[in-house]
Amino acid sequence: RSRRQRQMCIRDRYGSGRKARSVLDDAREKVASLLGCEPIEVIFTSSGTEADNIAIQGLYAAGQTNRIISTDIEHPAVRDTVSKLEKTGAAVDILPVDRSGHIADLSVLDTLADVATCMWANNETGAIQPIEEIATRANATGTPVHVDAVQAVGKVPINFSDLGIASLAASAHKFGGPRGIGLLLAKRSPAPQPIAYGGGQERGIRPGTVDVAGASGLAAALEESVSEIAAQGERIAALRNKLRDGILATIDDVVVNSAEPCLPSHLHVSFPGADGDSLIMLLDSFQIEASTGSACSAGVNRMSHVLEAMGVSEAEGIGSLRFTLGRLTSAEDVDYVLAHLPEVISRARSV
């Protein structure tokens, strides 16, 4: 089918419109089969951020307790949404995490809330959270659970129907699909109230013209990534472990912040005595791209809210790096990093 057909309005009754509708239906059914849900539960969005906003704001609006449960390690898409609702009157209770970045206490789930929101896997450390336990505990009180699975979809097996959660967000570019397209899996009951209004597309939960080409690309990428979860997970984990072990063997005073259960793609490491900005610039001089665990506020570097929630010291947090590996990462790439990283750390610590 041509890209032009995919760009036609799915509500048009002429031939190309019907073909566009068929492409969208195929994409929806494929996503449903891959993620273990019904096609009607698949809602296409513009991003994972939009999906998180629809779910959290929509489930909160549908509730009556004015209470939200979340964590202190969420992505800004969730963290800022919860903060906005708190400023408008929501009471927010936090699921605490331990030093490994995993949720350590589920007791706040024992009281009913309008929504409990938790990421499946952390974008900085890769820590995988006990989603099944969270859902079971929340379901006992009737609290709907939303899961930000942007980091997890395509990397871990997911069966939405078996999880017992109300909604789940994902973004295509995180599993090799096009940018600008995401998805929200949402049960018919409890369903999020719409936070925008218009043409009534996507069950009225996400009104607006659907990006049919994007949805088709999302479904194709998801099919490929899901088929490779086991093989790629094993390969990437081996490379991640090689990188971790090499760092520990060649550099003194290193703190590994990524702890199992963890995504195979993530390695978060602290180098006390080094500054994150210096690390990034020095790595860039060798064409090595990594992320710092700190954030910039008014020109002053500070460690991320994720590390703060974990209880990481300031010295460790400021000098931290996140390495992410993927399907294109090779053993030669890891060897190259290990060949240059000791020099980078030494120079950064001497600044």
Question: Can you describe what each PLM-predicted range is?
Answer:
Residues 162-220:
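Active-site PLP attachment segment
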Residues 15-16, 222-245, 255-263:
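Structural signature of PLP-dependent enzymes
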Residues 57-112:
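PLP-dependent aminotransferase-like
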Residues 1-10:
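Single conserved hydrophobic/aromatic residue that forms the stacking wall/gate
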Residues 302-351:
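PLP-dependent enzyme catalytic core of the Aspartate aminotransferase-like
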Residues 267-322:
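Conserved C-terminal alpha-helix-loop-beta "cap" of PLP-dependent enzymes
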Residues 93-154:
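Active-site phosphate-binding strand-loop segment of PLP-dependent enzymes
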Residues 18-32, 37-65, 74-81:
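Conserved beta-loop-alpha segment that forms the PLP phosphate-binding cup at the N-terminus of a helix
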